[in-house]
Amino acid sequence: MLRVTGLKKQFEADRGASVAAVDNVSFEVETGKLLTLLGPSGCGKTTTLRSIAGLEEPDGGEIQIGSSVVFSATRRFSLPPNRRRVGMVFQSYAIWPHMTVFQNVAYPLEGSRVSKIEVRKRVEQVLALVGLEAFIERPAPLLSGGQQQRVALARALVAEPEVLLLDEPLSNLDAQLREQMRVDLRALQQRVGLTAVYVTHDQIEALAISDVVAVMSAGRLVEIGTPHQIYDWPKSRFAAEFIGAGNVVPVRETQSVDGKSRGRVPWGEIYFSHNGQTIPKALVIRPEDIQIVSCSTKDNVWPAKVDQVVFLGAIYDCRLALGDMTLRAQFPRSAGVEVGQLIHVHVHETRCVPIEE
């Protein structure tokens, strides 16, 4: 289990000013679960991760790993990194080129009271976990990028950490290998029952690998939830636009009609699902939830003009003109849409998601 409470970290900027890299961030990771810190560059996700590892000294807050508090600003207490029972996989992998695979993986156990026989046993076990047991004596320079990533993961696991920390570990791999490693890493985490915190700016990666996604922006935790919750029911404009490129549409004159919520959008009338007490200011419509229909005999059907079509293999990524707004839509290749085509589109009311900002 990992608990982060009220974490704060500031860095000095130009002319003596300070920047809040991490601003009152709190979250908890249950034992055996993987939480991803997701956000753009400079949002504070890596600083948060490094604070958990003990590589950054926070200015405020508390960090608890298992039953032990490893950092407390109020108590002025900070446990050294080597005593925090964490393993870390860096973005650069940090594989030593003058060592073999065995020497790289065994390095965290140097200076410990673990016997040579036990060291060998542990290294063989973690290499088997990552599928590299046959490479144990191979020199590090002879490893591929994917193999180096696996060695870095094995090294992080060999000391049997309570929490595994991963700082964009797949970003240096090509697209196809990155996708395969994503699957393998998730399978390993679930099989071993690792408690893990994963940092990435890749939205697809975060959705695919996580039990919980924590969205960060400008040092703050904007939103937290399961991948389905974050994607299907975002609460903030930032989360809606950053994950999945949702269309954020202003809505006004909202009212309840026959148990449904109705409002005005720039191109006309719209029905949407809304069970909250507050009045929404905007609706989120995902590109894949926009469907082409043959007529306008039901609710939420509007005329649209196809302004742009980009072929992406399995889908067409389109820009549609509805009134004065442009919406992004994704259609199957069977739709056969063309630039300039006039169509009717439909969005089910349950896929028009209200947000308050």
Where in the sequence are the language-model features?
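Helix-to-loop junction immediately C-terminal to a conserved catalytic motif
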Residues: 53
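Conserved A-loop
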Residues: 9, 24-29
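Conserved ABC transporter NBD signature motif
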Residues: 61-73
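The feature captures the beta-strand-to-loop junction immediately N-terminal to the Walker
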Residues: 38-40
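ABC ATPase nucleotide-binding domain
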Residues: 3, 28, 64, 344-346
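Glycine/charge-rich catalytic "coupling/switch" loops of P-loop NTPases
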Residues: 232, 259-309, 334-357
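ABC ATPase nucleotide-binding domains
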Residues: 84-87, 91, 95-238
